[in-house]
Amino acid sequence: MDYLNLDEIGLIAPSVLTQTQSEHLSHIYKHIPTTDVMDILGENGWYPTKVMQSATNSGGESRIPYKKHIVRFRNDENDNIAKEIGDTFPEIVLTNSHNGTSSFKFHVGLFRLVCSNGLVIADQTFNQYKIRHKGFEKSAVIDAINEVTTNIPMVVGKVQQMMGKIMTPTQQKSFAQQAVVDRWGEDRWVDIDDVLGVRRAADKGTDLWTVFNRVQENMLQGGIITSTTDSVGRIKLNRTRKVKSIDENIRVNKMLWSLSEAMI
């Protein structure tokens, strides 16, 4: 596995490398560089594989160093687990920002190699672990790592259960329809065939795990046909866009995991 170095990370998500806090924050806020946490993860065998930061909107260029960012970490010791669940690797997913809007949050993640899907496990399966910007101890990061590591076998077991549950076409549509309601509400028509669309031969399966991954990828990558009706009855067709918001990406992932877990 080729891990990301700091130069590569800086090109994609410069906020990860920020060493100072935003000027508008009070003295109560204690700046903790994301790289300090990454160093501790590295000492424990977890290295960065993928990064992303929020898009620039209000505040312009001056806000870029403090944007919310997400870093996914993988440990080579878990590679054997990937063989048990179809080339899907357990991960630690770390989110943070340096603008005072977010603490460090550790999530359990899964990375599916065949489609480069990055999943995030719902809170009822693994409650996210937080470290606030008011004080920092190395032991807190190690506790978070241990919490994730302890829960990996349980998460793998859930995936194996999903892989073993075969879904009828009716069940697949019901799953997709509920996902649509949870994602967009009940006021928008959405093409369910697009939501369930198969993007590659490896995703033609009818087990819950494969269906879950198809829906997740289609919702996050965009391209699903939808329509809305205005106040005078005019219908407007649209295609969904790729999800670029870190918070929305995690929300959709956790929503779909919860929906899938309920169907086991």
Residue spans for each PLM region:
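Intrinsically disordered, low-complexity regulatory segments
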Residues: M1-T35, D39, E43, Q53, ...
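Sequence-level detector for tyrosine residue identity
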Residues: Y3, Y29, Y47, Y66, ...
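A broad "ordered helical/assembly scaffold" signature
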Residues: H24-S26, T49, A144-I145
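Amphipathic, interaction-prone secondary-structure segments
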Residues: H31-F104
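Intrinsically disordered, low-complexity regions enriched in serine/threonine
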Residues: D76-I264
